[in-house]
Amino acid sequence: LSHLYSETLLAPGLGASFQWRHQNNGRDLLGVIDPESPVYATLRQSIERFENTVFELSLNKPNLIEWANSQDTLQDAADIRELRLGGAHAFQQCIELLQTMQMMTDRVEDPVRISAIHHSIGDVMGFIGQRSGSVHYLEQAALSYEQALEIRTQDDMPLEWAHSTYNMALVIHIIGRLEDDTGMLKQALGSIHKAVALLPRDDDTDVWAAAMSSAGTVLYQLGTHRRGSRTLQQSLVAFRNVLTERTAEKNKIAWAITQNNLAATLQAMGEHEEDIGSLEASIPVYDSVLKVLDRDALPLIWAMVSANRVSAMYSLAAESDYLDMAETSVAGFDKISKLFDGTEYVTYQAKAAERMQQAKELVASLQV
């Protein structure tokens, strides 16, 4: 399953649309490019440089170049940003190369190749659109996938059809998130379900699990948007299915993403349904993620999961009138806020401070 898109790490603690790219399956994009091309080596390096990068999904960042130059974790070397800056240029060059290849390839003589080129253009356009928050690029990506699907029919090329259908669903999902359009989220979910049905779970469990995880994420977002307990239940089922394939032994990072998202869904159910049991169940799941994550290697991820855990404690304290837990959540949000001291993540720090104030108000109300 070739794509460059990141996976969502649900972050209710700080209210962020937090994205994390870890899969590195964009290397398949190189399959349609001549290894002798000067773009080939640069693109290969660029795909690797964007691996394990994180960002917040938001509309209309200035451009991919500026995004790449500003990316860091809480502690990141300046030369890494420069490497990613060069990588951003490479993706722009890749589009030009693929479009040239598209013009030079005859659809009738080589339909398989032209469909792969359309699909690859979609991947790069979609990557730039997701990173920069550009709906224009995302719409161009969707158009490229549609062109690929004119050739990759479900009957003639079922697996390729599933790949392009799934990637187009990811693009639609991103647009839906950026524009707060539940109709597009529903459309994305329908396409993901169709693709998952044709993806070979036994032959490639990683691909199947990634697609099922995407379904769980969209269900969560729909469920929290309309406060739908049934939809959140479906999200829980999806994430639990993913965890039958994603284990900490196989892939620690993928497992951690899924465990966090499972906990966030339990937390959402507890908050929306005033269900103390679900809130209580979410906290040890967050704990299990924090025990596995390397705080020094992934400080921003660790901070997000920690904020989620504290927010679950806050919600449980509010629902159960637990004064001690409310006081613990004050200290927890204060600790999260201080993690961002001296960093560029002022928005996250401000949100943590805001949540700390809410927790203080809860403490005051419980002391009456």
Which role does the model predict for each range below?
Residues 53-66, 101-114, 131, 148-161, ...:
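Flexible helix-coil transition and linker loops at the boundaries of alpha-helical arrays
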Residues 1-127, 131, 366-368:
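Flexible inter-repeat linkers and adjacent short helices
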Residues 15, 31-45, 79-93, 126-139, ...:
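Short coil/turn connectors between adjacent alpha-helices in alpha-solenoid helical repeat scaffolds
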Residues 340-368:
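Terminal, low-structured helical/coil segments at or just beyond the last alpha-helical repeat
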Residues 69-86, 113-130, 159-177, 206-224, ...:
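Conserved alpha-helical positions within TPR/SEL1-like repeat arrays
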Residues 43, 64-66, 90-91, 111, ...:
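Inter-repeat boundary and helix-capping residues of tandem alpha-helical solenoids
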Residues 50, 91, 98-101, 138, ...:
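Hydrophobic/aromatic packing residues within the alpha-helices of TPR/SEL1-like helical repeat arrays
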